[in-house]
Amino acid sequence: DALSEDVALIVDMFCCLFEVKEAGLRLTRLDSPMCPKFHFDRVPCRLVITYTGRATEWLTNDTIDRTKLGAGSLGQPDHLSGLYDSESAIRRMQPGDVALLKGSGWEGNEATGLIHRSPHVADNERRLLLTLDFI
């Protein structure tokens, strides 16, 4: 079917791009945010594609205060922590977008992994999310 063909193509392209023989694949149906707070991944690079539902949200480096990530938020929600100044700073991917999220595990990128989160999911809304990682 179309989904399995697309997943196979995405995996092939990911492996070719990064010259790896295998990739860790996760295909997940979600009815709540998997990662509701902004964070960065401790991997070299993660491929993310949302097939249905709201897609991943992210922030550019020039709009954030990284000291407010994790414990630095002092338990505050993202919008109150001082991580970013306004809601207009939040960028949103669209369903079907293929994104390569560079993480802190990328050589030379240890302090600047892409800051992102799962979007809020409305009642009765579901997401179908594919992620690929190096293994």
Task: State what each model feature region is.
Residues 1, 18-23, 71-74, 99-105:
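N-terminal start-of-chain detector that recognizes signal peptides
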Residues 1-29:
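Signature of the catalytic double-stranded beta-helix
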Residues 11-15, 37, 45, 116-119:
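Intrinsically disordered, low-complexity boundary segments flanking structured domains
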Residues 14, 18, 51-54, 103:
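Short, well-ordered alpha-helical segments in soluble proteins
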Residues 24-28, 49, 100-101, 129-131:
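A structural signal for short, well-ordered beta-strand segments and their strand-loop junctions
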Residues 30-32, 53, 104, 135:
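Generic structural motif
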Residues 32-95:
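Catalytic core of non-heme Fe(II) oxygenases with the double-stranded beta-helix
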Residues 82-135:
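Catalytic core of Fe(II)/2-oxoglutarate
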